Design a protein with these regions (language model features):
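ATP-dependent adenylation/nucleotidyltransferase module used to activate substrates
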Residues: 11-221
């Protein structure tokens, strides 16, 4: 079960309970800041991360708007900072062409292509969260926690009753596509080089990202 208790500033994931660093009001206040202040605070966080890891960092670069803004802000401070792009084979040609316009970009490739991933693990459907819960119910049946997302027990964004028919889908479903094709190459690169990634995400993109930000803020050391 995932919930937040604003008064006590607690956040719970399953049986694990951690104190949150911020409240939803903190987030709303920061989101209302003028652009200049947001840029200043963001670059301060980049400097903190860079210094904490003694410069052994890189920008995780997908060619999308969020990581492009991040790379621009980072290179205003550290012009030679490396960017790392994972070429999954699923990117639009325009994205690949756009990434090639930047210098000092390391291109990585996953060891498995998309066809191999869906054959071994299953299709990603709806979202990673939905795919994960469907996979767990398919594998473990009604005795697992995920079943509560489909029988009405869980509420809010955890209620997935409308996707319940997918449990009976005649094909495998999994959330492993992103892990295998994007996260794993990045982790292997980090292990090989000793570098830590700078990742640009927006809290307003999902409830999960809001929860992550409430718990740890912008940087997670």
């Amino acid at each position: 079960r995932i919930y937040q208790l604003e008064r006590n500033r607690m956040f719970s994931y399953g049986k694990e309970i951690k104190m949150a660093l911020y409240t939803s009001e903190d987030l709303k206040k920061m989101q209302s800041w003028p652009l200049e202040r947001k840029i200043q605070v963001t670059q301060t966080r980049i400097i903190e991360w860079y210094q904490h890891w003694e410069g052994k960092v890189y920008v995780s670069f997908s060619g999308g708007k969020d990581s492009t803004v991040l790379l621009d802000l980072a290179r205003r401070i550290y012009p030679d900072i490396e960017a790392v792009f994972v070429d999954t084979g699923l990117e639009y040609p325009e994205i690949r062409a756009f990434v090639k316009t930047f210098n000092n970009v390391t291109w990585l490739k996953p060891k498995m292509n998309f066809k191999q991933v869906i054959e071994q693990y299953g299709y990603p459907v709806i979202s990673k969260r939905v795919s994960r819960q469907i996979h767990d119910v398919k594998k473990h049946g009604e005795n697992c926690w995920a079943w509560g997302c489909f029988n009405g027990r869980e509420k809010g964004f955890l209620n997935m009753e409308k996707w319940k028919p997918l449990i009976e889908a005649p094909f495998k479903i999994s959330d492993q596509c992103c892990n295998v094709m994007k996260k794993k190459p990045m982790k292997e690169y980090g292990k090989k080089t000793g570098k830590k990634a700078i990742i640009g995400t927006r809290a307003d993109e999902s409830q999960q990202r809001v929860g992550t930000w409430l718990k740890q803020g912008c940087n997670a050391f």
